Regions:
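Glycine-rich FAD pyrophosphate-binding loop
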Residues: 16, 27-51
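FAD/FMN-dependent oxidoreductases across multiple families
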Residues: 75, 236-317, 329-333
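Short beta-strand to alpha-helix junction loop
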Residues: 99-120, 238-243
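Helix-loop-beta segment of a Rossmann-like dinucleotide-binding subdomain
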Residues: 91-109, 146, 231-235
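Predominantly flavin-linked oxidoreductase catalytic cores and closely associated redox partners
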Residues: 120-258
């Protein structure tokens, strides 16, 4: 950290958000540009539960590139040996990870995973501020961003940064304040319930099952837990009143496979609604800033690409930032172009996958997935 006048901290790069994308930027910068002063500002203490995710085996090279592969293995996340899906028909089909190049995947404890990445960045010299929010970004005449940072105990200080990374997730709070517009491609929500497993829940596969008004997801969690979600559009979620536990379980009992996995389990909470819509920013870079991870673009959970995309995005962003500090702005242009191409490819894959399910032609949920994508600016 570089100090300046009273109550002002100076950094080359200020990263707003300490999730996988923000941490990946920091870790990669420490590797490729160790002279840069870098700070992460994270709103949480990494102590609240976070929705889990199945991490594909292909993440191994990214974690190794960031220098955290051994630390990741030491966390002992639950193994995931593949995915089972009932999609386009009632019969389950399996995709076994173990036959691929990198073997098994993992059911992530996201809280521990995110905290591990941030801790590794801090150990490498990144300043980590937790329970801290950033407000009032201002760009004064000297070209540096000025940020006001507040902790949860109401202490505040100012930060001067030559470059800002928006890693604030779907909110994209910094980028949107700079005029970037969020373009929505659907209104997908997840109604999530955490459950305590029964003794019969022994398989470690992620289970995906299509239903008339959406689709179901379930995966194991540490400590004999399981997370399950009913995924549908916001208007359908409201119509079915899925925040009501009884209504959620009524829908779950209409499934063919998910109910057999969940009925032995005991719910630990009422359904929680979380945004899962696909979106992108109309631009992911600007004057001395860029957006990474879900702040730049977010994929449908069906892709199982959330954390993988976040890490890859963070690494690519770090290359663009390194070029910027060498006086070369073309890296930011390349980053913008790569992001656009990646999202175009995702939309094609998304359309192909949803197009495989044709059992409910009169369902609004499936009709929307089979129609041409209509862009919506938020």
């Amino acid at each position: 950290m570089l100090t300046g006048e009273d109550n002002l901290r100076r950094y080359d790069v200020a990263i707003l958000g300490g999730g996988p994308a923000g941490a990946a930027v920091a870790l990669s910068l420490r590797k490729h540009a160790p002279s840069l002063a870098v700070a992460i500002f994270e709103s949480s203490n990494y102590d609240e539960p976070r929705i889990g995710e199945t991490l594909p085996p292909t993440v191994q090279p990214l974690l190794a590139q960031l220098g955290v592969w051994e630390s990741f293995l030491a966390e002992n996340h639950l193994p995931a040996y593949g995915t089972q899906s009932a999609w386009g028909g009632d019969e389950l089909e399996s995709n076994e990870f173990i036959y691929g190049k990198f073997g098994r995947g993992w059911h992530l404890d996201r809280r521990r995973f995110d905290a591990m990445l941030a801790r590794e960045a801090e150990m490498r010299g990144v300043d980590l501020f937790t329970a801290s929010t950033v407000a009032k970004p201002q760009k004064p005449h000297d070209g540096r961003w000025r940020l006001t940072v507040r902790s949860k105990d109401n202490q505040s200080f100012s930060v001067a940064a030559n470059f800002v990374v928006d890693a604030t997730g779907k909110r994209a709070s910094f980028a949107t304040r700079q005029g970037a517009q969020k373009i929505l491609f659907d209104q997908l929500l997840g109604a999530f319930v955490f459950l305590k497993c029964g003794a019969t829940t022994a398989d470690s596969c992620t289970l995906v099952e299509a239903a008339e008004d959406g689709w179901w997801y379930s995966a194991l969690l540490p400590g004999s837990g399981i997370v399950a979600a009913w995924m549908s559009d916001a208007d359908i979620v409201r119509r079915h009143r899925l925040k009501d536990a009884n209504r959620w379980f009524e829908q779950m009992q209409k499934t063919v496979h998910t109910k057999h996995r969940l009925l032995p389990a005991e719910p630990l909470n009422k359904p929680e609604l979380h945004a899962a819509y696909s979106h992108r920013l109309d631009r992911v870079t600007g004057d001395r800033w860029l957006a990474v991870g879900d702040a730049a673009m977010a994929f449908d959970p069906l892709s199982s690409q959330g954390v993988f995309k976040a890490l890859r995005s963070g690494i690519l962003a770090s290359y663009a930032i390194c070029d910027f500090f060498k006086g070369d702005s073309s890296g930011l242009e390349k980053y913008q172009s790569l992001a656009a191409r990646e999202f175009d490819g995702y939309l094609k894959t998304r359309a192909e996958f949803y197009g495989q399910e044709r059992r409910w032609p009169d369902s609004p949920f499936w009709q929307r997935r089979h129609e041409q994508v209509v862009l919506q600016k938020e």
